[in-house]
Amino acid sequence: MLDREGFRPNVGIILLNARNEVFWGKRLREHSWQFPQGGIKYGETPMQAMYRELHEETGLHPEHVKIIGRTRDWLRYEVPDKFIKREVRGHYRGQKQIWFLLRMVGRDCDICLRATDHPEFDAWRWNEYWVPLDAVIEFKRDVYQLALTELSRFLRRPAQRAEKPRGPRVSRYPRVIGAQAQTLTIVDTSVVCSEIEVEASTLDEMPPHVIVGK
């Protein structure tokens, strides 16, 4: 379903945790990372499409999230010809998106990348809201920046946690991605939803939080 200008109606999702960190999914068998997104089917409202895509790509249900904002209007990006199927070239130009900002009220272990038979992601992680977008495919970066900027007005300051005495750090394991080693600090491995703190400053540097099948 395309509009008169050749853009497909679509929804994008920026999912936050309690610390205002953002969910990123690694595209299946690729090295690029992105937010959940998907087309709006005929007869669907943007909100209905958002909840469907949220479940298909992250396994989350409406009760796991709270809507805290959305973009006022459509945001558009054009897709380069090399990514467009030959039979629709000349008709299809790209996507026009309504973006939703969600707050996750469930737990990390509620996320399931295999909620459907056709998963979009094979890994996921939390990262800072304003992380550099180098690992996002190039033609989507501008619209990501626009969505993040417009929706940032809905952000609230994360709850302050009481300072705990700093003891020696334990259970550190090197992880190598490409030629670069990363360090994970396992905070609590005794619960199903274990928390992992990762020392990294950019999206590309961060190792996956969860890998499908492991």
From Swiss-Prot:
Q: What does this protein do?
A: Accelerates the degradation of transcripts by removing pyrophosphate from the 5'-end of triphosphorylated RNA, leading to a more labile monophosphorylated state that can stimulate subsequent ribonuclease cleavage.
The record's keywords, sorted A to Z, are: Hydrolase
* Enzyme Commission no: 3.6.1.-
What enzyme class is recorded for this protein?
hydrolase
Q: Which InterPro entries match?
A: Nudix_hydrolase, NUDIX_hydrolase-like_dom_sf, NUDIX_hydrolase_CS, NUDIX_hydrolase_dom, RppH
- According to the lineage, what is the superkingdom? Bacteria
- Organism for this UniProt entry: Burkholderia cenocepacia (strain HI2424)
Q: Which residues form the Nudix hydrolase domain?
A: 6-149
Where in this protein would one find the motif Nudix box, according to its record? 38-59
Q: Which cofactor does it need?
A: a divalent metal cation
What family is reported? Belongs to the Nudix hydrolase family. RppH subfamily.
Q: What is the lineage of its organism?
A: Bacteria, Pseudomonadati, Pseudomonadota, Betaproteobacteria, Burkholderiales
Q: What is this protein called?
A: RNA pyrophosphohydrolase
* Gene3D superfamilies, sorted: Nucleoside Triphosphate Pyrophosphohydrolase (3.90.79.10)
**Its Gene Ontology molecular function terms?**
pyrophosphatase activity
Establish whether keyword Hydrolase is in the entry.
yes
State the PROSITE patterns in the record: NUDIX, NUDIX_BOX
